[in-house]
């Protein structure tokens, strides 16, 4: 309906981009893209669970605020923060390394491959299996597959327009679609 500009409203359903698994993968992609969105970084710092506590997150934010830097920059420099204990550092560093590896992959992967790498490298599906029923995990997997299809559509649309698909461009398009989905046509 959106493709043909037909106004519609979902009753009793949930906007695709408001689903937990879609918000999670988008937060990973935003963090890979530039790390400027502190909320995105905070959303995924414990997805899947890494044992990073709220106190550590608060201390990172305080350091970021005091030094006028982003939350991500504070996270990268966590070893320089006196109030962050070694035990917390040992949990933060693998997360920073993971994002670094995914950023390196962005250089030579398609966006589809990058999105799949996020799901695979983070162990996202496996982590869902620990807390949800088989049916819930399968529904989330199907939503992630649909997201991958949307990424492929974005890449194909760019190629048809003679443009290079970029992660920033994908995220901008998703933001626009999310805004359109939230419009009230009544």
List the model feature ranges, each with a label.
Residues 11-19:
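Conserved helicase motor
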Residues 2-7, 19, 26-186:
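Conserved helicase C-terminal RecA-like lobe
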């Amino acid at each position: 309906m959106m493709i043909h500009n037909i106004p519609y409203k979902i009753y009793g359903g949930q906007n695709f981009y408001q689903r937990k698994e879609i918000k999670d993968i988008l937060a990973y992609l935003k963090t890979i893209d530039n790390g400027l969105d502190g909320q995105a970084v905070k959303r995924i710092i414990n997805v899947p669970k890494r044992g990073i506590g709220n106190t550590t997150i608060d201390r990172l934010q305080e350091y970021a605020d005091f030094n006028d830097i982003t939350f991500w920059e504070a996270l990268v420099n966590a070893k320089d923060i006196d109030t962050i204990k070694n035990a917390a550092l040992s949990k933060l560093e693998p997360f920073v390394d993971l994002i670094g590896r995914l950023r390196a992959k962005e250089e030579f992967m398609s966006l589809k491959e990058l999105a799949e790498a996020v799901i695979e490298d983070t162990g996202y599906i496996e982590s869902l299996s620990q807390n949800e029923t088989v049916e819930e995990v399968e529904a989330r997997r199907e939503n992630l597959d649909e997201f991958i299809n949307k990424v492929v559509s974005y890449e194909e649309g760019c190629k048809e327009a003679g443009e290079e698909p970029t992660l920033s461009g994908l995220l901008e398009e998703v933001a626009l679609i999310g805004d359109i989905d939230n419009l009230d046509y009544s």
